[in-house]
Amino acid sequence: MKRTYQPKKRHLQRVHGFRKRMSTANGRKVLARRRAKGRKVLAA
C-alpha cells in the first residue's frame, strides 16, 4: 500500500502559500495572528 502523503511543492504553495493567504480577508487574519504570536515562518 502506498503512503497517503505524496508531497508536491506547487500544491503546497497554492494551498498554503503566502500569496494565497494574502488573497482573502480570512487569510490575512491568519497572517496577522501568526505575526502577533511571533511566528518566524508566516506561511508555507
Swiss-Prot record:
Intrachain S-S bonds: none
GO BP: translation
Region (Disordered): 1-25
Gene Ontology terms: cellular component: ribonucleoprotein complex; ribosome
Chain intervals with Basic residues compositional bias: 1-22
UniProt xrefs under Pfam families: Ribosomal_L34 (PF00468)
Entry keyword annotation includes Ribonucleoprotein: yes
Superkingdom classification of source: Bacteria
Keyword Ribosomal protein carried by entry: yes
GO MF: structural constituent of ribosome
Protein keywords: Ribonucleoprotein, Ribosomal protein
HAMAP family: Ribosomal_bL34
PANTHER family assigned to the protein according to its UniProt record, in alphabetical order: LARGE RIBOSOMAL SUBUNIT PROTEIN BL34M, MITOCHONDRIAL RIBOSOMAL PROTEIN 34 FAMILY MEMBER
Family named by the database record: Belongs to the bacterial ribosomal protein bL34 family.
The protein's name in its UniProt record: Large ribosomal subunit protein bL34
Organism of provenance: Oenococcus oeni (strain ATCC BAA-331 / PSU-1)
